[in-house]
């Protein structure tokens, strides 16, 4: 597996509520959660492992699951092999599979294990004689009560269990099941709501009542992320609890803005802090409802791969669970939607109580209850990695886990990805908007696993996201399907504004150009859209996976065969489709050969035979970009400062410093010259380090030494050595080598004072730009950072290609250009 491949890992969804009657399971989907084959296989593996552990261990604490024990009094080898013989009787899908809660079952299995050991010892003495008496259910129940009330260290006296074969055990289970059924019938006659078949079955091997208690946390743990793992299953949700005043949203709560979250999933703000939307709820008498529901919890059951566990869990919580739960909380606060639906579900269960199967009950509930319907549709669509369009209180809401079909850099050769993925650096524009999910370039990124690869709601830099999102107006939209098919799939009206907008989208026109065209045609056809509406429609189409953001397709742009082209997977099939779609054009292999035939990439115009073929070639190019065969080649530039420029600027600074010193009174000589010499070289004092100054200072140092010591021999020799080193020509060479290389200005838009001097020197003396080009240079200077392509620069700054070509030719010796996707 890979993080680039969709893997929701969802097994089911539970709706649990807490009322005055306690925790209750309202609805589960799919209805046959107990029949999950993956869980059954995990339980079987756990059976064998736990059985072997019981055979070799004398510990009282056994790491076992609900179906670990099979009663048999044969030898150890026969006991280990008994799993296969008793699988049909011990079926986890049946009601009589469990004897009670999990703690009760563990206590019972402990007693059965003790009995098996004593039975084996007794068989050795008495010749393996067995009794035909049955296990008394009352004694088992008393054992359960004793195990609950007593301490774990206290020895519980074994009852008189003289038979442990499978037939007797099955009779015991059936008798207990009958007693449970009779107690249920008594409860229904006493006025307590009857337990429906959907709440009395086991869920993935666990008793429903046990799960309900576990999935209804205390109030202090609600309104924040809930996550618990049992065996290989993860129960994930966002429990919503009402406040003391009866409202479902704190009146004074707000979302504090914070910086980036710290490392680790445990420090994620969405996990530990209270999750609240930035919606101002009105605390009215209606919000302080008198219903008996104090909490509801929509729980997603997941079984992700171990190495992807953190990432898949965070992904599901971020994109689906948190957003869906908050929408339900909003509807509950405003209209009591959840509570009204739950009461309806209880009434529907009462009507359907005497019907045949659980599957029929689930279908009946999904047909009648909108809450059950949205839960079932959410599971169906999310498990298929589709978009879940849910109707919540007659309002359409969309939820999805974005598919990773956009890459800003080439993945490793061992990293799987979806065929037809798009490779372009322009995807970074929408990386922080949540509309797309950028693909991973390595198989398992440790940082992404720790943080989930996801930004929290509060972790997005708003300013950065807004500026990037605004740039979409300069891009074009490439529809990923036929316009009429998209209109039909999104269920838009044929003559609606959105439908007309979809029909007008062309990959050769930017959205800004489309907006200007609509303004001009508004007086004629009465159809107008401003830039804000166009951006909103574009974001919706991208989120619905109906469109892709690209730079407008042009014959003057350069296109190459994408390194991620699905040559080995879909090539033969796409050859037939391409020939059928564009019969007048060369075949798909020949078309790709035209784009990559030359050693140097060239413009698309050189490939088109004539103007009559222009539209056909542009349509074919759009088709190739849509299916990931072709990507555009972008040009990025940096501003380079040569060594010559830096030396000139340094000379100017030295001259300015010398002039400033002449204007000031001369400072007194420092007698501690030796301290300055030993302190190291100061680059700021290089202007004073000429040979005459060095000799003068050395003579002063000799005079000071003679006056102090009278024995100048050793000190004079040391001073002579220092003088030779300072006057040596190698010092000058070493000083030049420090600044011998060229410098690339990473961010010229935020250049320092020294870097601005370098840039001014390049423009004024080296390039001798005209006043017009100088003005244009400073307008485009911020884009010379290697992050913004020149193709986008032409669209944003309204610069003609001729002006840009003239400017780049004038500063050719002082720029570094790179071309990539």
From Swiss-Prot:
Record region (Disordered): 29-64, 116-194, 246-283, 654-694
Origin: domain of life: Eukaryota
Compositional bias annotation for Basic residues: 249-266
Position of the signal peptide: 1-21
Alphabetic keyword roster: Meiosis, Signal
Gene Ontology biological-process annotations: cellular response to amino acid starvation; meiotic cell cycle; negative regulation of TORC1 signaling; positive regulation of autophagy; TORC1 signaling
UniProt entry tagged with the keyword Signal: yes
Comp. bias intervals (Low complexity): 170-192
This protein's GO CC annotations: GATOR1 complex
Listed Polar residues bias regions: 669-688
Stored PANTHER family: CGTHBA PROTEIN -14 GENE PROTEIN (PTHR13153), GATOR COMPLEX PROTEIN NPRL3 (PTHR13153:SF5)
Similarity comment: Belongs to the NPR3 family.
UniProt name for this protein: Nitrogen permease regulator 3
Organism name: Debaryomyces hansenii (strain ATCC 36239 / CBS 767 / BCRC 21394 / JCM 1990 / NBRC 0083 / IGC 2968) (Yeast)
